[in-house]
């Protein structure tokens, strides 16, 4: 007996591995750089050069890039920066990995510390967590009927979520920023940070709209008589449309964005003066778009003239419970410790959202974590004005998801929308944070899916042993379908004036 099926795509995680790598290395200050007198600020980033795949293993090669802003140990006490590369090579065991699989890789620098050994040597310690996984699309055929029109069919209406689009893409954000007229030309770029903030991702017809802003900071030495220290903050709003064939506005996007590379370069203007900062950021997008379809799923068949047995296999089918794009606001006051003077001005602050735990609670998802905040500020010391502090702001937020249960699965995206730091007085700073906490929740249902129908001749002896007339007292939960199938008869809906033969 041939089944009529509906083909649907489901995305499954084939294999996954999590490795932690520790770094503990000494680094010598390059000969072209002066001695270190005092460290101001540090930052680290991971650069992956290659992923080599073999049977069951993936070998990562790359480097941990560490940058340091410091004050020289000379009479001038000028500010300099240096950059060091710590090579990494790590084998990750991924059971079931095969040649040709595409390994997705994520990482998180959980801890980074730089200690001054002496003026020409520093010690770098770091803990980095790598998560590698492979996802593959599985074709699932769901039965919606049989070709034999004489067979009685039992169906159930249901909503099924399928993966309509799964792809990766790259977008670039480029912008030239002119210095204001009251700023001197750039002599040397010392330090910079580039962040993504305020992401808004929407599905449209055959495209994905990505909206956000690049928030950048630059500290430089001016090309004036004193090589004065100058800085600027600038926001670069962007909106780009990424081609995505098969996408539509009613699909549910689950798009993860990472910025593996950003570059800030000094450029010349039309007069040949170095008064332009060019930012070039590379954004990687992993796009998954889900589509919900309404089906009448075939759950059983029978006929009084043959014995039909449905062979089933259990699957977890998903349907949309809720999508909730919520915002979490956090305000806190932090004391400035170990400063050598009173704060005169805050130059720049940046932050990173780190989710420590998620938990399904009544009608929601409890999200807890921290925002790591770095603040660069100036004190009233003309010889050594720049100082930096790092702090962690905890947060706890419940994303509303009515009727969520432990059987549900969810995808969470957390990113920074706004971060502001304001001086309360000369030794206290107020931090205001707005985060986006976006969740898409799917309800999972264990369903026995019919794979095929096996037909056999009726057991004549069993039929002959059955009474010719049966009086049956209906029990709670009975349906005409179950009764008719049990006694090898048909559903006489027209005689019972029932509109739904599956209910009594």
What are these regions (language model features)?
Residues 1-495:
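Viral structural modules
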Residues 496-502:
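Conserved small/polar residues in nucleotide/adenosyl-binding loops
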């Amino acid at each position: 007996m041939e089944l009529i099926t509906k083909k649907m795509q489901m995305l499954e995680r084939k294999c996954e591995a999590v490795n932690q790598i520790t770094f503990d290395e000494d680094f010598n200050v390059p000969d072209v750089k002066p001695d270190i007198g005092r460290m101001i600020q540090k930052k680290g980033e991971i650069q992956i050069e290659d992923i080599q795949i073999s049977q069951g293993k993936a070998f990562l090669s790359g480097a941990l890039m560490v940058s340091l802003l410091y004050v020289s140990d000379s009479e001038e006490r000028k500010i300099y920066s240096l950059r060091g590369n710590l090579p990494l090579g790590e084998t990750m065991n991924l059971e079931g990995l095969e040649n040709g699989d595409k390994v997705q890789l994520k990482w998180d620098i959980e801890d980074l510390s730089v200690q001054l050994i002496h003026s020409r040597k520093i010690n770098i310690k770091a803990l980095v967590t790598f998560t590698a996984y492979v996802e593959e699309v599985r074709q699932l055929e769901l039965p919606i009927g049989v070709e034999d029109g004489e067979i009685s069919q039992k169906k159930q209406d249901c909503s099924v979520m399928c993966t309509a689009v799964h792809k990766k893409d790259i977008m670039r954000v480029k912008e030239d920023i002119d210095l204001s007229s009251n700023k001197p030309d750039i002599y040397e770029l010392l330090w910079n940070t580039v962040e993504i903030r305020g992401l808004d991702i929407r599905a449209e017809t055959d495209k994905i709209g990505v909206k956000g802003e690049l928030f950048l900071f630059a500290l430089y030495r001016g090309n004036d008589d004193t090589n004065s220290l100058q800085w600027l903050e600038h926001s670069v709003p962007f909106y780009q449309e990424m081609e995505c064939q098969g996408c539509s506005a009613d699909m549910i996007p689950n798009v993860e964005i990472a910025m593996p590379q950003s570059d800030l370069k000094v450029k010349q203007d039309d007069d040949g003066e170095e008064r332009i900062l060019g930012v070039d950021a590379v954004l990687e997008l992993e796009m998954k778009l889900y589509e919900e379809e309404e089906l009448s799923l075939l759950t059983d068949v029978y006929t009084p003239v043959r014995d039909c047995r449905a062979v089933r296999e259990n699957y977890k089918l998903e349907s949309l419970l809720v999508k909730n794009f919520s915002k979490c606001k956090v305000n806190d006051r932090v004391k400035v410790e170990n400063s050598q003077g009173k704060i005169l001005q805050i130059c720049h602050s940046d932050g990173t959202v780190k989710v420590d735990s998620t938990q399904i609670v009544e009608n929601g998802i409890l999200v807890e974590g921290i925002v790591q905040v770095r603040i660069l500020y100036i004190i009233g010391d003309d010889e050594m004005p720049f100082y930096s502090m790092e702090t962690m702001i905890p947060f706890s937020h419940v994303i509303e998801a009515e009727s969520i249960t432990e059987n549900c699965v969810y995808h969470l995206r957390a990113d920074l929308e706004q971060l502001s730091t304001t001086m309360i007085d000369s030794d206290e700073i107020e931090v205001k944070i707005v985060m986006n906490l976006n969740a898409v929740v799917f309800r999972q249902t264990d369903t026995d899916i019919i794979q095929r129908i096996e037909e056999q001749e009726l057991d004549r002896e069993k039929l002959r042993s059955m009474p010719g007339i049966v009086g049956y007292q209906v029990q709670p939960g009975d349906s005409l379908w179950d009764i008719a199938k049990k006694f090898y008869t048909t559903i006489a809906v027209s005689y019972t004036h029932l509109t739904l033969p599956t209910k009594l």
